[in-house]
Amino acid sequence: MADHDLVLKCWGAVEADYAANGGEVLNRLFKEYPDTLKLFPKFSGISQGDLAGSPAVAAHGATVLKKLGELLKAKGDHAALLKPLANTHANIHKVALNNFRLITEVLVKVMAEKAGLDAAGQGALRRVMDAVIGDIDGYYKEIGFAG
């Protein structure tokens, strides 16, 4: 619970512009981990140079951050939010668990820069995401997805 609160202290800066911050997160993810772009077939027609300014990338990034905000605000009581997300990410998108770890590291960096997330908050975000990823892993196992 305390970890969620540490992260939520800075969440207002993220909420203030979900599209810009979400676009930043996804673009950094694609730049730092180019293989992750393959998980987003709807961006396949966008050249690497045009990804940064793409409204589609920003919109999807906003969706990601809004869902993360819901998970943070649930403060660990997130089964109703997380189970359907795990289901779609396993059955439709085929997202391996490691990709959630990769985006976590990008989130930590972006929140440090854009929202003032300090070292304690960064550790808190990593711990929260570790718990979320652990729960996703449990759901993946339930449905037989080797993520």
Curated annotation (Swiss-Prot):
Nitrite binds at residue 60. GO terms for cellular component: sarcoplasm. It catalyses: Fe(III)-heme b-[protein] + nitric oxide + H2O = Fe(II)-heme b-[protein] + nitrite + 2 H(+); H2O2 + AH2 = A + 2 H2O. Residues 2-141 form the Globin domain. Its EC number is 1.7.-.-, 1.11.1.-. InterPro entries: Globin, Globin-like_sf, Myoglobin. O2 binds at residue 60. It is found in: Cytoplasm, Sarcoplasm. Monomeric. Monomeric heme protein which primary function is to store oxygen and facilitate its diffusion within muscle tissues. Reversibly binds oxygen through a pentacoordinated heme iron and enables its timely and efficient release as needed during periods of heightened demand. Depending on the oxidative conditions of tissues and cells, and in addition to its ability to bind oxygen, it also has a nitrite reductase activity whereby it regulates the production of bioactive nitric oxide. Belongs to the globin family. This is Myoglobin. The lineage of its organism: Eukaryota, Metazoa, Chordata, Craniata, Vertebrata. The gene is mb.
